[in-house]
Amino acid sequence: MKASMFLALAGLVLLFVVGYASESEEKEFPRELLSKIFAVDDFKGEERGCKGFGDSCTPGKNECCPNYACSSKHKWCKVNLGK
């Protein structure tokens, strides 16, 4: 039952995309649509001045972002709970 509902929904979505693509004047629409669906986050490539949650760090160097602290036991940035 669940599989048939999923297939019906997927078929409707596919029908909508194909119908919209056929009405589109641009011939690059399917490629453009796929690139937007599977786009990679651009901000992940940017470097920060500090390290976020789970990044490796050296205790005592204050490398972690605000609200994070370098764990001396595990040597990675974790949430600073004020202890």
UniProtKB/Swiss-Prot annotation:
<protein>
    <recommendedName>
        <fullName>Mu-theraphotoxin-Hhn2i</fullName>
    </recommendedName>
</protein>
<comment type="similarity">
    <text>Belongs to the neurotoxin 10 (Hwtx-1) family. 15 (Hntx-3) subfamily.</text>
</comment>
<dbReference type="GO" id="GO:0008200">
    <property type="term" value="F:ion channel inhibitor activity"/>
</dbReference>
<dbReference type="GO" id="GO:0044231">
    <property type="term" value="C:host cell presynaptic membrane"/>
</dbReference>
<dbReference type="GO" id="GO:0090729">
    <property type="term" value="F:toxin activity"/>
</dbReference>
<keyword id="KW-0800">Toxin</keyword>
<keyword id="KW-0732">Signal</keyword>
<feature type="modified residue" description="Leucine amide">
    <location>
        <position position="81"/>
    </location>
</feature>
<keyword id="KW-0738">Voltage-gated sodium channel impairing toxin</keyword>
<keyword id="KW-1015">Disulfide bond</keyword>
<feature type="signal peptide">
    <location>
        <begin position="1"/>
        <end position="21"/>
    </location>
</feature>
<comment type="function">
    <text>Lethal neurotoxin. Selectively blocks tetrodotoxin-sensitive voltage-gated sodium channels (Nav). Does not affect tetrodotoxin-resistant voltage-gated sodium channels or calcium channels.</text>
</comment>
<dbReference type="InterPro" id="IPR013140">
    <property type="entry name" value="Huwentoxin_CS1"/>
</dbReference>
<comment type="subunit">
    <text>Monomer.</text>
</comment>
<dbReference type="GO" id="GO:0005576">
    <property type="term" value="C:extracellular region"/>
</dbReference>
<keyword id="KW-0960">Knottin</keyword>
<dbReference type="Pfam" id="PF07740">
    <property type="entry name" value="Toxin_12"/>
</dbReference>
<keyword id="KW-0638">Presynaptic neurotoxin</keyword>
<dbReference type="InterPro" id="IPR011696">
    <property type="entry name" value="Huwentoxin-1"/>
</dbReference>
<dbReference type="GO" id="GO:0017080">
    <property type="term" value="F:sodium channel regulator activity"/>
</dbReference>
<feature type="disulfide bond">
    <location>
        <begin position="57"/>
        <end position="70"/>
    </location>
</feature>
<feature type="disulfide bond">
    <location>
        <begin position="50"/>
        <end position="65"/>
    </location>
</feature>
<keyword id="KW-0027">Amidation</keyword>
<keyword id="KW-0528">Neurotoxin</keyword>
<keyword id="KW-0872">Ion channel impairing toxin</keyword>
<keyword id="KW-0964">Secreted</keyword>
<feature type="propeptide">
    <location>
        <begin position="22"/>
        <end position="48"/>
    </location>
</feature>
<feature type="disulfide bond">
    <location>
        <begin position="64"/>
        <end position="77"/>
    </location>
</feature>
